[in-house]
Amino acid sequence: MSVAKKEYKRITVKSLVDMKSNGEKISMLTAYDFTMAQIVDGAGIDVILVGDSASNVMAGHETTLPITLDQMIYHATSVVRAITRSLVVVDLPFGSYQSDPKEALRSAIRIMKESGGHAVKLEGGKEVKESIKRIIHAGIPVMGHLGLTPQSIYKFGTYTVRAKEEQEAEKLKSDAKLLEKMGCFAIVLEKVPAELAKEVAESITIPVIGIGAGNGVDGQVLVVHDMLGMTHEFNPRFLRRYADLHGEMTKAFQNYRDDVKSRKFPSDDEQY
C-alpha cells in the first residue's frame, strides 16, 4: 500500500505575515545544496535560508566573512532548483552591502536574477538603513537580522548573548521598529534574552524568527548541519539535535570500507 505524499501550499512573504497574524509558528532551516534543500522542502519547512554560514559548514572557515557574493549565488541557485514549496531567503555576504547603498542594490539584484531566490537577508539596523531602503524600493523583499550579527564578530570579539545591557536592548528594539517601518517582511533575532525577544516580537507586526532567542518569538531557525548532529564541535545552549548523523554516517563509511577491504562489496547481485 502506497502512502500519499502530503501536499503543502507554496510559501510567500505574505504567507509569513499571515502566519504571525494567525498565531502559527514559522519553521526555518538553512540549506546550501540541491539534495539537502530537496529534503528540507519536502519535509514542509516554511523557509529555507541560504545562509552565509555556508562559509563555516561547507567551506570550513572560522567565520562567515570569507564567503563571496559569487559563492552565495552558486549555493542559492542549487537550492532554488530543488524547492517546490519553501520560501528561499539568501544572505547578502559581508562586503556586499555595507559600504554603499548602490552596491547593496547591485548585490541584491544579482542574487535575485542569477539564483532565482525569493528574498535577501542582511545584518544590522539603523547603520544599514539606506541599503535596506534602496533594496526594498527596487521591489526586492528584505529580511532583517539583529542581535548577534556574525558578520560583526571582530567588533563583538565573541559569539556571546547580545542586548543584555539596557542601552543595547533599547537600540535593538528601536532597530526592530525601524526595519518594520522601512518595509522588511521579517527579522531574525540571534542570541538575545528570551524576554527581550518576546517583547520585540509583540511590539511589531512582522514575524520575528529566533535563533537562541527563546520561545516567545514567531518562529525558529537552525543551521541544518547542527540540528542533524553532523557537527559535534558546536554546542550552544539553544541547539537541539534531532539526529546523530555524524555517528550514523561514520558507521556507514566504516561498514563500506570494511566491505570493500574484505571483498564483500560488490556482491554477485550488485554486478552486471
Swiss-Prot record:
Q: Which domain of life is it from?
A: Bacteria
Please list the residues that bind 3-methyl-2-oxobutanoate: 52-53, 91, 121
What InterPro entries does the record tag this protein with?
Answer: Pantoate_hydroxy_MeTrfase (IPR003700), Pyrv/PenolPyrv_kinase-like_dom (IPR015813), Pyrv_kinase-like_dom_sf (IPR040442)
Biological process terms in GO annotation? pantothenate biosynthetic process
Coiled-coil region list: none
What broad class describes the main subcellular location of this protein?
Answer: cytoplasm
Instruction: List, alphabetically, the Pfam families matched.
Output: Pantoate_transf
What are its E.C. numbers? 2.1.2.11
Keyword Magnesium assigned to the entry: answer is yes
Cofactor(s) needed, names only, are:
Mg(2+)
Q: What keywords tag this UniProt record?
A: Cytoplasm, Magnesium, Metal-binding, Pantothenate biosynthesis, Transferase
Mind telling me which GO cellular component terms the entry cites? cytoplasm
PANTHER family per record = 3-METHYL-2-OXOBUTANOATE HYDROXYMETHYLTRANSFERASE
In the record, the note on similarity to other proteins reads: Belongs to the PanB family.
Q: What is this protein called?
A: 3-methyl-2-oxobutanoate hydroxymethyltransferase
Name the source organism. Answer: Christiangramia forsetii (strain DSM 17595 / CGMCC 1.15422 / KT0803) (Gramella forsetii)
Q: What is the lineage of its organism?
A: Bacteria, Pseudomonadati, Bacteroidota, Flavobacteriia, Flavobacteriales
Q: Which gene encodes it?
A: panB
